[in-house]
């Protein structure tokens, strides 16, 4: 009996697990924790979309301002908390822009 190699055609697929859980597991965990803090603090609905309800124009500007405040370590957070907040705010800005692009290209 010969040993056969299994085929899996996934070379062109995005490696979500590898990137999120292998490359950046600690960073992802902290950003998820920061997201939960925000959800608990500003919860309006249980859908985790309260951050998005600001609307694109107000939301992007608000999160850009927050990102810069944390980038310059303005406030009482420790350095690592500021870095986590920078990452979260960058993701929020990117998500606004990607959603706009997705809907504009329909």
For the regions a protein language model found, what residue spans apply to each?
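Intrinsically disordered, low-complexity regulatory regions
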Residues: 1-106
